[in-house]
Amino acid sequence: LEEFVKTLQNFINGKNVPSSSDKTQDLINPATGQVFAKAPVSNAKDIDDAMKSAEKAFETWRDSTPGERQKAINKIADAIEARSEELIKIESENTGKPIAVTRQEEIGPMLDQIRFFAGAARHLEGRSAAEYFKGHTSFIRREPIGVCAQVTPWNYPMMMAVWKWAPAIAAGNTVVLKPSDTTPVSTLWMAELMQEFLPEGVINVVTGDRETGRLLVDHEIPQFVSITGSVRAGMEVAKEASKDLKKVHLELGGKAPVVIFDDANLEAACEWIAVAGYFNAGQDCTAATRVIVEASAYEDVVTLLSEQAKNNIKVGMPEEDVLVGPVNNANQLSRVQGFLDRVPGHARVTAGGSKVERPGYFWSPTVVADLRQDDEMIQNEMFAPVITIQKFADEAEAVRMANGVKYGLASSVWTKDHGRAMRMAKAFDFGCVWINTHIPMVAEMPHGGFKHSGYGKDLSGYGFEEYTRIKHVMTNLNA
C-alpha cells in the first residue's frame, strides 16, 4: 500500500505506466494537511495513448456477450469486496473521510451499484418490433457507443468512478477516466484490480488537472463524454464537446431545498436533516443544506438544528468515531471562510461559523438563520458543512423559494399531509424529491437534475441507457 500511493502512475492498456509529462502535483491528506504522494499531470501524449488503447480494446469488447460482461463485472465486485479494508484506507488517506463512515455508508452501496450494472448488461431491450411498413419487419438495436471519456469529482472518488465505468463497460464500451486532480488514488487502485478480469485497454485512468481534462474532451476518438463536477466545469465540457458534436452527460452542482411544514415531526426531521446536511462535510450535491421552514415552526427548527450542530455532529480525524471529516482541500476551506466572512447583517450564525483549530482542513458544523432569497449563501453551492435556514408563509411561497435557484438536482418536503407532499413533489423543479427523508439513493432509481445541475442520468436503467446508441434495422420479409 505505501509503495502504491507514493509512486502513482497512469493506468493504460492494462499496465501502470509513467506519464510522458515531467509535471506532477502533490496529493495532500486533508485531515493532516501533509503531502503523502505525487500524481502526474498528464499531457496530450498520455491522453492519446489511453484513447488508442481504449479504441483498440473496443474492437473486441463490443462483441463480448452480455453474460460475459456480467460475469466479469461481478468478479470485479467480489474482488473489491474481498479487499475493501485496503480500499477504505486508501480512500480515507486521500480524502480525510472517517473510516467507519466510509465502511458503513459507501462500500456497501458502491458494491451494490457495480452488481446492479452487471445485471443490467443482460437486460437491454429494443422497445419496438413490428411490421410498420407492409412486408417489412423493423426492430431496434441498442449498441455501445465506443470509447467514453469520463471525469469524476473529489467528493466521492471511488463511488463516482463506479458510477462512470460500471454502466459504460457493462454496455460494451471502453473507458478513459480522469479522476479529480486531488483524489486519484482509489480510482487507480480500482483500475489495477479490475485488470485481472478485463481485456487490456477496457479501463484506462489518467491523472491530471483542468488542462488534462480539456485534452480528454477535445480528443477525436471518444464520442461520449460524462462528467460529474462543478457547473463551471460542466459548461466548459459541453462547450468543448460541441465542437465535435460529442454526446454529453453532465451531473453538476446542487442546492437542495428542504421544505419543512409545521405539522412535521420537527425533532425527528431535524435529527435526520443534520446528518443529511453535514454528511461528508456537506460536500454532496444533494446535501440537505438549504432549509426552508413554515413561519410557525421556524424558531423551533432553528433551535433544533443548532443543537444538533453543536452537540450531536462530531468532527474529527478518520480513525475517530465521528460523522464529519475535513473539507477536501485548502482552496475549499478558504472558500467556505469567505462565505462566512460575508454573512449579511440581517442573518445570524447560530452554530459553528469557524474553522476547527487543528491541522488539516476542518470546518465546524454551522447553521446560519434569517437569510433572504437573494443572499449568496442561498443562491450558490457552498459544498461545506453549513446549513442555511429561511422562513416561508404558505405553500406558494415555499415553492417559489425552493425553485428560486439555478440548480435543479434534489429536494425534500417534510409534512404529515400526504396531499400537500404530493403537490410539492409535483411543483418542485428538481430531478429527485424525497418526502419525509433526504439523501437515500438506490441503484434502481435515476440520479440527475435539471437546469444548471446538468442533464442525463446516473444509476438505474436510465443511467445504463446513457451509454448506448439506438439503431433501427428494417428487413424485407419477401427478399
What are these regions (language model features)?
Residues 33, 69, 91, 114, ...:
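Residue-level signal for inorganic ion chemistry
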Residues 232-372, 435:
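ALDH superfamily catalytic-core signature
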Residues 34-124:
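Glycine-rich loop-to-alpha-helix module at the N-terminal edge of alpha/beta enzyme cores
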Residues 126-268, 392:
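Rossmann-like NAD(P) dinucleotide-binding subdomain of oxidoreductase/dehydrogenase enzymes
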Residues 32-38, 222, 259, 355, ...:
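Conserved C-terminal structural/oligomerization subdomain of aldehyde/semialdehyde dehydrogenase
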Residues 58, 62, 77-84, 88, ...:
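Structural signal for hydrophobic packing residues in well-ordered secondary-structure cores
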Residues 1-31:
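Hydrophobic face of amphipathic alpha-helices that form TPR/SEL1-like repeat modules
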Residues 36-42, 57-63, 150, 258-261, ...:
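Short, well-ordered beta-strand elements within core beta-sheets of diverse protein domains
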